[in-house]
Amino acid sequence: MLQTPMTGMVQKLDQKLPVANEYLLLSGGVREGVVDLDLDELNVYARGTDYDMDFTLLVPALKLHDRNQPVTLDMRHSALCHSWLSLRLFDEGTISKWKGCCTIADHINGATNYFFSPTKVADWFYDSISIVLSEIQKKPQRGMPKVEKVEKNGTIISIILGVGSSRMLYDIVPVVSFKGWPAVAQSWLMENHFWDGKITEEEVISGFYLVPACSYKGKKDNEWRLSFARSEVQLKKCISGSLMQAYQACKAIIIKLLSRPKAISPYHLRSMMLWACDRLPASYLAQEDYAAHFLLGLIDDLQHCLVNKMCPNYFIPQCNMLEHLSEETVMLHARKLSSVRSDPAEHLRTAIEHVKAANRLTLKLQRRGSTTSIPSPQSDGGDPNQPDDRLAKKLQQLVTENPGKSISVFINPDDVTRPHFRIDDKFF
């Protein structure tokens, strides 16, 4: 958790933010899929050209505490995994502070009902941050980062700070923070999961968020999306290094290849990986030298989800995150993925070259000055899991030794003591 001087100054500006607040800092920007947000409205930033490191900071505008029972949200007006938020849950003081950031509707009993508006909250937050940053720049203090860029991307505020010779991108997201667990995801807890026995249920269900994003047909001014970013930080502790390496490699490929039109995001890939962890035997996923096989499996899973227009939210499986896609978009991306599947090593090498080029730009800038240490975020994998040449070589070996053949991961849950994968109709 991190409380930044900037958000502290925003709190002092008009006393809207909670005084005792917790901010979740995640390694990787919103474009990296660390939070389930829509990427359509985001400006394109390139690592190396625009920034060297990226983070996502979740800033609670409101907090609701656990009442020792599942949290029930008002989902009558929303698609699955989304909700409106009425300020009737809060005291009069909170309503008075925030009613300017609400839409208004008449309640059934004749009273005025204020619904917390994600777009209005984002507008207020951007204006407040702009005022605070302007004040900071007027009176610069020793050791304070240099503000290089501030932009509003939909409901997200993106700030690039210069710290020493490093440029850090922060995607700041205003959220509503809840302690406890939503009633709509209660049935998920009843299922068996890969993390059972590795971490406690209390660690997984310690809290969730509403983030400012609406469903495909939802009302932008009213609808929030459920986010389980806090839980995902805990679940990542249970994922093997080789699978995380495959995930990072696959993510690097799809960010470049499937960027237009927006259909598949890194968050979709993350959800597929979590489902794979539930589906496959732990002893298989623990294999240290199986990153290449895992990458092929993730590509296959991605292709399957696209063709079937089906990617269930990991925590709320009844919510299909791809149901809104058109057939045209599905087929376009499916063809692109087929090209990756036919020569995954080449596409991975291209992604690696992009990473290396970005790193060269970063090093070039860092030689001009010394770097300054930064706070450690809740890591999304970090550099050790970046795609590397060894994985590309392993993929190349699998493809070269079996020209023109379909290679897929196959799991026999009754026997995971040796490699299992399929080449055409033969299993090995």
Curated annotation (Swiss-Prot):
- Here the segments flagged for biased composition (Polar residues) are 368-379
Q: Which GO terms describe its molecular function?
A: nucleotidyltransferase activity; protein-containing complex binding
Q: Where does the record place the modification Phosphoserine?
A: S373, S376, S379
Under which main EC class is this enzyme filed?
Answer: transferase
Q: Which cysteines are joined by disulfide bonds?
A: none
Give UniProt keywords alphabetically: Nucleotidyltransferase, Phosphoprotein, Transferase
Q: Which Pfam families match?
A: Mab-21, Mab-21_C
Where Phosphothreonine occurs, the residues are T372
Residue ranges for the region (Disordered) are 366-389
Key word Secreted present in the record? no
According to the lineage, what is the superkingdom? Eukaryota
What are the transmembrane regions?
A: none
Per the UniProt entry, the Enzyme Commission number(s) are 2.7.7.-
Known role: Probable nucleotidyltransferase that catalyzes the formation of cyclic dinucleotide second messenger in response to some unknown stimulus.
* Family affiliation: Belongs to the mab-21 family.
Name recorded for this polypeptide? Nucleotidyltransferase MB21D2
Q: Which gene encodes it?
A: Mb21d2
